[in-house]
Structure formats: structure tokens, C-alpha cells
Amino acid sequence: MSLYQRYLSKSLIFIFSLFFLILFFLESSIGFKYFFNFTNYFFIGLKTEEISGNWRDFKLKKINFNIFGTSIKAESVHIITDPISLFKVSTILKKIKTKNLVISFNKKIKKVALKNNFLKEKKIKNTIFFKHSLILRKIYSDKILLKTQKKNIFLFGVFSGLQLSNDTCTFLPTKINSIYIDSSMRNVKNIDNKKSNFFIKKDIFYRNKIDNALSFFSIFKNFFIPININLINLKCNQLKFFNRTFLDIYKIKMSAQLKKNILKIKKIQIYSKYFKTKSKGKIFFRSDFSIFFIVKNEMSINIINNKAMNLLFKDTIDHKLNFKSNNLIKFNIHGEISLDDLNYPIHINLHLNRLFLPISKNLILSSKNFNFSLKGKINNYFLSLKNIINISGMPSFFISISAIGNIQNVVIKKIHFFPFFKEIKTKKFIKIKKEIDYNKYITQLAGKMRILSDFNKQSSNIFLPYFHVYGDFMRKKISVLGSLYYRKLNGITIPRINFLLGKNKGHISGSISKKVNLRSSIYANNLNYFSPNLKGIIKATLNIYSFCSLPSFSSVILGQKINWKNILYFNNIKITTNGNLKKSFPNKFFADFKNIRFSKFHINSLHIKSDWNNINQKFSLSLKDKKLSITFILNGHLNRKVGIWKGVLKKIDVKTSWGQWISRNNPLIFYHIKNSINFKNIKKIKNKNAFYSAINNIQTSLFKLIRQSPVKFQTDLFFNTQFQWKLRENITNLKLFLKGSNINLEKKIKEKIMFEKISAVNLYINFKKNNFITKWIIKKSKNSLKVNKISGFLNIYDFFHEKKIEGKVFLSDFSCSFLNFFENFFTKIQGKFSGNINFLGTIYQPQISADINFQDFYIKSDKIFKYMLLFFCSFPNKIENIKINQEIIMKKGNALFKLNSVVKNNISHIKWNILFHSNKLAIVLFPKIKLNFSSQLNLYYFLSKYDLIGYLKFSFFSFKINEKNFLF
């Protein structure tokens, strides 16, 4: 072997040994750490607290890096390399994963003149040139914060890739879960998640924001990008602006390419709550430092029925922003904004060849040659609008608006509009008075309006401290004077709005927010204003209240001496209504007409009243005249157990000069409720001759009641009723009002006669479409110092389907002696009770709760001992045959009752519980045997079984009760 070959072989051995040692050194964690720190110290300048792994897969923790005034920090960076690619032209990093990456732009961007003070374009291109390709296949970051002095931009869940080759930077398909934009007026310490509390409030920004926006255009119109950028596909699922939720965007899709200072927008799609846009076009960064753009857009806005509009933006940005936008079909806009003058003079004109806005299917707003103009400065401008507006189904009208304003305030100088009813002969608004023949029904509005808008707080306020509408409309003089305030947090406030319709006066006041509370009234003594030859006086009030989504209303209409052409005359009118807009009809209705004349026909009085409850339905009508008297009462009853609804003519009383016809308790209509479990499908029982059957029952029902009942009943009743029903259809409308007075009850038991008197009974029922509303009052005595009455309401909503119930009963020192007439188990009952009963749920699954107080209660019977023994299984059965006179006396007591339904095996079961308590009880077995005691008893029922738990405490002993699972 020659000397040359010997040295060559030794050199190769040495080189391979050295290469192996270096490779072994880099493969070890300690060796790679020393190698990274050495190269980092001389070349990179990256600071890190911990290094782990080797040159193929390594992880850096808590890094800090500064370059060109930009600070980069991260909690950790994990990099996986492709070792083979290090020896090729293209270097590949398989994966880069960062955690809590923060990029801070610390230095301000200063305005520069690239023509004189910046590097030449060619020099920059030579400087920024990627001689070796670098490919980052997968880039993932859980959280990225981009910090500037005035903005914080948070990116969550970023998946991307990057390729640098020659002078091109390519972003591989990129996905971002969410982006949040907020102010950076305070330090952000932690980045936890998208719900983290590092978003803060901002100061008012009006002038500064405009300065920054216009300065941006004036600076960056002179800027060019020295490299080519290719964005293959970008998708962002959410973009949010904190404290400006109205700008939130649901989804963004983007694809673009920047090559040789030409930005080609392949696709931009933006989806928001209020609009959707699709855009494509080109932006040219010219060598004379001007920017030319042409962008085609397709936009749809929700408030105008999502109708698509095609827009074309085409113009040049230089020292001034001159812009033009042409709708490919219907409109164009052009204007001018200075980018160099701090006063920012502006001039914007909007012209629409044809405006077409379908607000709804039957309401369309349109206008030809629509013009809008805004001139002046940002903080001192003038705007005007003059156009003819057409609304479907209404006359066209001309409107002219002129106003002045600044950033915070808009003052409307004048709003002028008038309708016309003949064909338009010209499009020139200047000559409109001369060239258009229209009816001069002119209405003018003059006033002031102040608009306050703070985007940081998401609040907008509109104040109208004074406005006045006056003039003629349809040859009728009108005048409206008042004030109006709108605050986003509190809604609309109306201190008072007064209006004059001729000589008729009225007013409106109240507020509208989540809840509405409006009060209005009108006093009309000039009825000829509304209809010719109409005379009289009308007073009316209307109140609207409760939630805006489900408002309720009540109204009262009073009329005096209403006369129309001496044909129709009402001496007195009273109409009251109460309702809820969800039900679309009055819940309560009462109408009272007195001294009615129609031509030669005369009526002394007419009363109509109606109301409902979930079991009994009533409707009343009463008409009285000298020769004719009609009283009509219609009742209905629902028996849920057997699934039958029954309609009964409670009373028909017709009196004429020829005689009187009276009928009571005549069954008229029957419904059978199929499937007693769900009670949803209601069908009428087939009866070929239902009307004949009803007439036949009239002859016997009253006499049958008199013969069988031991109770004599006497009263003065009056009712008003309305009933609407179509054959083979559900009842759609029923209203009834029943008023009874001087009600006398008489019952004879064992040669003893009992009397009871009830002073008044009022019942109001209203059933319409699918809801059943009732209200009632029973007064025991008019002369009593205490209230002494029962009142309440019981309503059924969605009667033919869900049958939801809601009701309350109020007991106010009401005497229970009337119970003697409706039961046969006790000889005598006396006392008073008070409290309330609540009803909820549905008819099939009711929920009832009651709280009843007893006072001076007295029960006498020879069966009390028998009923008490039912709860004690251990007593002999024959002891119940002992009959002695027994009395129970209770000075005070209380009973709590709860009833619920439980669904078991698709069957609804009722369970209830009664808790009784009294400290002052006495039982009298014989005239001389009286035992005083106190008691607390809890009776529980479920699945036909009872539990009784409690005690009876006497003077010398106490008796505990614990009986369970017994049957009656």
C-alpha cells in the first residue's frame, strides 16, 4: 500500500469516526443540549429554561426571543425533524407544536415615505430570497396571543403548515377554531381558554379610531410586499369582538394569492348573524404607490328577507380614497375621503335605480331613483334624502329628510312627507309641486333627536326630548306632541305623548323593554271626525302590560248618547275586556247597553257577559224591554273520569205579552272523550235527532229536579251569553256572564227546616278557539263587617290538546253552613274558613295545593264515630253500629292539602296528602260528656291505599296513630 493510500484510509477513518462521534453526541440528550446552547449563543439568541430530547425530537420550555422589536414567548415548543432532509435541498420539519404562544409587537409603526427613505424594491427582493426550501408539514398551537399597544388578538386551536421556497411563502390548509379580538389596555397574565377573563373594557374611541383608520390607508398605500404569498385555504369557525357582539362572525373561509404585488382574492366567505357575503377579485399595488382594486361581492342581509345583492367595488386609493360601488343590476355609490387632511372632508352619494325590499310576504317597500347624500367633515356633516316611497297596499308618498350631525349626535332639522294618489309624471323632485297633481294632505314633523353610541359598552341611546307632528291627513287634522327616549339597557320610555284628532284628545305613556307597560286614554266628543253624522261622547282606556313576548291588555269603553242619523241610538254603553295576545281573544268580556233604539225598535237594556273554568262553563245574556224579556244561560260540565263533556241550557226565560216560557237544566250537547288516559281526541256522540231530544228534555228536566231534590232554591238571576259552534267541529267561541242575587236555600231534614242566604254570585266564562277562562265570586252577606266571600279563577289552556290548567281560589271568612244543603252525612255544619287553593298542571295530571284555616267549626252527626273507626283497623267491626249523637267543636284549626299525579307504567295515578292541625278541639258524646284535646293528623293516599300518622292529645293521656296501607 502506497503512502497516499495509507494517509487517505486513515483520514477517512478519522472523518467517519468524527462523524459518528458527532452523531452520537447529538443523539444523546446531554450532547444535543450543549450543541443547541453553543449554536444558539452565537447565531440565534433564543433564551430557554429547559431543553430535552435529541436532534430528531426535542422540546424547549419557557422560551423568549426578540427580533426587530418583536417579542416571542411560549410555554413550550415541541419540534420533530426529518434527519434525512437535512442533507437535501429541502429541509423538512415534520411537526411543530407550541403551547401558550405570545407574540408582542412593541414598537410603533412609523409613517415612512418609501420613495426616498426606504430600500429599493429589487434590493429587498434580493435580501428576502429563500435559497433552500423549508417545509413545516404540521403546525399546531393551542393558544396564540398577538399583542399590540391597542389590540389583543387571541387564536385558539390553530392547525396549519408552511412552505418557504425561492421568493414564495405558501400557507398549507389552515384551520382556526376561534379568534377573539379585544383591547390591550391592561396586561394579560394568563391565557387559559376562550372563556378566560382577560378581556377588558375600552375608552371612548371615536376620534382616535378615525385617525388610525385613515392613517392606515395613507401609510400602507405606499407599501409593497417583497415576497409572494400563497394562502391555499383558511377556515375559521368563529370570530368574536369583545364588547361589540354585533360584529361577531360565525364562520370565515378564505383563499388568496399575492404575486408580483398583485393580490388575487380567490374566495372570501363570511357568515354573520346579520349578513352573508361571498367575494372575489384583485388588488394591484402599483409602482407609483397607488392601489387599484376591483372586487365582486354577493351579499344577503337578514333584515331584508335574505335577498341576494350583487355588488362591484372598483376604484383607486391615492392621497384620497375615491370609491365607487356598482350593483350589477340596480344601484351605485361613489364618494371621496381625504387621507392627508386631518379635518377629513367627506362626500358620499348613494343612488339606487330601483330599491326593492321585501320586508315580508305581503309587505314590500320599493322606490325608483333613490338618492342619499352626505357631505362635510367627520365631526360636522350634513345629510339629505329625497325620494318617493311605495309600500304594497298603501298610497305612495314623498319623503324629504334633512339633518346635521357629528360622531355622537344627529339633529334632524326637518322631516317632510305627503301621500299622493295619482300617477307620477316626472322623476324630478325639484318640480314635484308643479308637475304632480296630488291631494294636499301634508304632514310635517319637526323636532330634535340625539343619538349616543358607545360601541365599547354595546349601548346606544336615542333621545327625542321634543317632537311635534301636525297637519292634515286624509282631510283630517292631526297633531301629536310629546317626547320619547330609547336606551338599549332599559328599552323605550314614553314620558307622555298627547294627540289631537280634530277636537278629540288622547294620550299615551309608559315603557317598553323586556316587559311592556303602556297606558292610554281617549276622550272623544267630536265623533263626526271619525264618521259623518255620528254624535255622542266616548271615553276609553287601554292598558298593555306583562312580557313583550306575551303581553296582556285590559280596556274600558264608556259611551253616552251615541246617535247615528237618528237611526241607531245608545243612551249608555259600557264594555270591558281583558286578554292576552297569545290567546288572540279577550279573556274576559262584559258589555252593558241601556236604552237602545234601532229605527222603531226599542230595548231597555242588554247585558252580555262570559267566563270559563276547566270543569264548568257558563255564558249569559239578558235582554229587557217593556213587552219582551229574554234571559239565557248556557252551562257546560266536563266529567274527566268518564270522559264526557255535557252542555246544558241552564235557563231560558222568555216573557212576552202573550205569556212566559221557562226551561231549566236541559241537556243540549254531548261530547265523548275517546281514550280516557290521554283525553286528547274529542268527538261528538252521534244523535240523529239531537234537537228534538233537547226540546223533549225541556219539558221534564225542571219537574224532575223539583221532585227529587230536598233543597228549595230561589234566586234572581241575570246572564249574558254568546255561543258559536259548527257542526262536526269543536266549539270555537263561548262567552258567558252569570249574576245571581238574593239566593235563598231551604232544606227540610227530620221535620226541621234549614235556611241559607247568599247575597251574590258572579261567574264569568270565556272560551274561544282553544282556551277556557273563568272567574267567579260568591258573597255570603252584604252587611257583614268582614269580607265573607269566595273568589277565584280557573283556566284551561290548549283545551282540545294539552289541557293545561292554572287557577286560584281565595276563601275570606266564608261561612260553611251552605254545605248542609249538599250532603247527607252530617246533621249540621257551622263555622268559617279562609285560605287559598292553587291549581296547576293539566287536567290529566293536576297539581293542587291548599292552605285552609278553620274558625268556630261545629259538626253534628250520629256517624262521626263510624267514620273515625275507618282509620283504625284494630277495632272490632261491630262497634261502628253504635249510633249516638256526636259533636265536634273546633275553635281554630289548619289543613294543608297537596295533590299530584305520578306516571307509572304509562298510567297516571293520583296521590294526595292532608296535614291537619288544631290545638283547640272538643268532642261531645253525650250532652254531659265533653272531651277537650289537640290533634295533628297526616293522611296520605296513593294506589288506593291510605296512611294515617299523628296523635290525639287529651288532658290525661295521648293517643298516637300509625296506621299504614289500609283500605276503605
From Swiss-Prot:
Report the GO terms under cellular component: membrane
Q: Is ATP-binding a UniProt keyword of this protein?
A: no
Q: List all membrane-crossing ranges.
A: 12-32
Its subcellular locations are:
Membrane
Keyword annotations for this protein, in alphabetical order, are: Membrane, Transmembrane, Transmembrane helix
Q: How does it sit in the membrane?
A: Single-pass membrane protein
Reading the lineage from the top rank, the first entry is Bacteria
> Hey, which family's this protein in?
To E.coli YtfN.
Q: Spell out the PANTHER family in the cross-references.
A: TRANSLOCATION AND ASSEMBLY MODULE SUBUNIT TAMB
Name under which the protein is recorded: Uncharacterized protein BUsg_080
